[in-house]
Amino acid sequence: MSHNTFGHLFRVTTWGESHGPALGCVVDGAPPRLPLKAEDIQQWLDRRKPGQSRFTTQRREPDAVKILSGTFVEDGIEMTTGTPISLMIENVDQRSKDYGDIVEKFRPGHADLTYFLKYGIRDYRGGGRSSARETAARVAAGAVARAMLPEMMIRGALVQMGPHKIDRANWDWNEVGNNPFWCPDAKAAAEWEIYLDSVRKAGSSCGAVIEIVASGVPAGLGSPIYGKLDAELASALMSINAVKGVEIGDGFGAAALSGEENADEMQSGPHGIEFSSNHAGGVLGGISTGQDVVARFAVKPTSSILSPRKTVTKGGDDTEIVTKGRHDPCVGIRAVPVGEAMMACVLADQLLRHRAQMGGSGRNE
C-alpha cells in the first residue's frame, strides 16, 4: 500500500509533487447536495498560499483550484453529487534549476535519504512528494469537509515561534488575521516580527507550535479503543510535513498536574451538563464531550538553511551541502490552515461514522 489516502467514510487521497505540473486530491464520501463551488475552496487555499509576506517562501503560486468532478449545477446552485470530488491545483512557479547541486547529495533533515533508501529513486526537485507543497491539496479537501460541518467553527493560531510563546492572557481571536503569523497575541506578534527577521536574514530557520480549536463539536463523536477521536486527530496532524509532536488538551502538561487539578468537574446547567474546565481537550475515552476540541502540534525548524552542512552523496562519499531555492524561515506559519483542514477532515469522517453506527439512537441525538 502506498498510503496516500486517509479517512474511513470521508476519504481523501492526495496526489502530485512540488515541481510536477499539478497536484490535487480526490475526496470521496461527501454527501450529495452540499453547495460547493471553486470560490468556497479558494478562500481557504488563499490563507495557505506562499509569497504573502517576507516571512514565507517567495515562490509565487496562486493555488487556483479547479473542480474536475463531483459537482453539478441545479437551479443555479453548484452542489455535490455524492460522487468523488476531484480537485486540481496547477504548479506555475517551479524553479527546478535551484536543485541541480543536490542531485547526488542528501539534504540533512529532509526526506531525501529515506525516500531513496525505501524506493531506490527520489524526486530531488523541492522534495517531490515530501514537500510541504502537498499540503495545498489537504487544505482543498478540508474546505469540502467544512461544507459538511456548518455548525462547527474550526480555527487555528500560532502559539509559539522558536523559544517565544504567547501570553495566553492576551489571547484574542480577532488578532489572528491582523498579523502575518496567525498570532492571537498582538504583543507577541510584534516581538516575533523582529525575531523572525533576524532568523531570516541569517539564512536560518525556526520551529513553531500551532493550536487548533474546534467549537460546536457535538458529544459522541469517536469510538472506544481503536477509533478514538483524539487518536485519529493525532495521526492526522502528525502526518503533516515537519510535524514532530502532537498533544490533545493539556497534553504533556497534564503530567505535571494533580488528579484534582486535571479532572474536569461537571455540574448540571440550563443546557445540560457543564464542565468547569477543559484539560481533556474536549475528548474523554476517545469520544467528544461537547466541549471545544483542542489540539496542538509542534513543527520543526525548516531544514533548508543557508549554512553549509555535512552530508553524504548517493555513492556514500562525505561532502558538504548548501541548500538553495526559496524556503520558509518558519514553516509553522503556513501550517496553521493545514492543521485546521486536517481537523475538519477528521471531524467530517467521525460524524459520518457516528451517524452510520448510531443513526438516531445515540443519547446526543
UniProtKB/Swiss-Prot annotation:
Keywords assigned by UniProt, alphabetized: Amino-acid biosynthesis, Aromatic amino acid biosynthesis, FAD, Flavoprotein, FMN, Lyase, NADP
Catalytic activity: 5-O-(1-carboxyvinyl)-3-phosphoshikimate = chorismate + phosphate
Biological processes per GO annotation: amino acid biosynthetic process; aromatic amino acid family biosynthetic process; chorismate biosynthetic process
EC main group: lyase
Cofactor(s) recorded in Swiss-Prot or TrEMBL: FMNH2
CDD domains: Chorismate_synthase
InterPro entries per record: Chorismate_synth, Chorismate_synth_AroC_sf, Chorismate_synthase_CS
Family: Belongs to the chorismate synthase family.
Protein name: Chorismate synthase
The organism of origin for this protein: Parvibaculum lavamentivorans (strain DS-1 / DSM 13023 / NCIMB 13966)
